[in-house]
Amino acid sequence: MAFDAIPKDLRGLRACLVCSLVKSFDQFETDGCENCEEFLRMKNNKDNVYDHTSNNFDGIIALTTPTDSWVAKWQRLSRFTRGIYAISVSGTLPQSTLRDMKNRGIVYKSRDRSQR
């Protein structure tokens, strides 16, 4: 896990709506999302950071060994990079992003558990 991917402060954190990676707004804008950058294109794009992340999330998980972790399997994170992840993320992706993901063959499962 690169130390620059770990949030430096607990205030103002956001979670990716696709993979639930938690970082600061500035970190998403500077580096994008390590798991989803290919199709979310958040790097150097404030609008995409706002559209594809949420500041409304519950719980956090520090994931250091995604392939060996039962928590990673439970949260569907085992194929993602090491980092800090939200347990539940509230928010919806733009329809254009959902269409793009579908066209790329990426199955989207909402990480919003607030209605359960």
From Swiss-Prot:
- Gene3D superfamilies xrefs: 3.30.40.210
Determine if Plastid is one of this entry's keywords.
no
Q: Give the species.
A: Drosophila melanogaster
Q: Which GO terms describe its cellular component?
A: DSIF complex; nucleus; polytene chromosome interband; polytene chromosome puff; transcription elongation factor complex
| Metal-binding keyword on record | yes
Q: What is its main location?
A: nucleus
User: Which CDD domains did the record assign?
Assistant: Spt4
Describe the protein's quaternary organization and the partners it interacts with: Interacts with Spt5 to form DSIF. DSIF interacts with TRX, RNA polymerase II and with the FACT complex, which is composed of DRE4/SPT16 and SSRP/SSRP1. DSIF can also interact with the exosome, a complex with 3'-5' exoribonuclease activity which is composed of at least Csl4, Dis3, Mtr3, Rrp4, Rrp6, Rrp40, Rrp42, Rrp46 and Ski6. DSIF may also interact with the positive transcription elongation factor b complex (P-TEFb complex), which is composed of Cdk9 and cyclin-T (CycT).
The record ties this protein, via SUPFAM superfamilies, to:
RNA polymerase subunits
Start and end residues of each stretch annotated as Interaction with Spt5: 1-40
GO biological process, any = transcription elongation-coupled chromatin remodeling
Protein name per UniProt: Transcription elongation factor SPT4
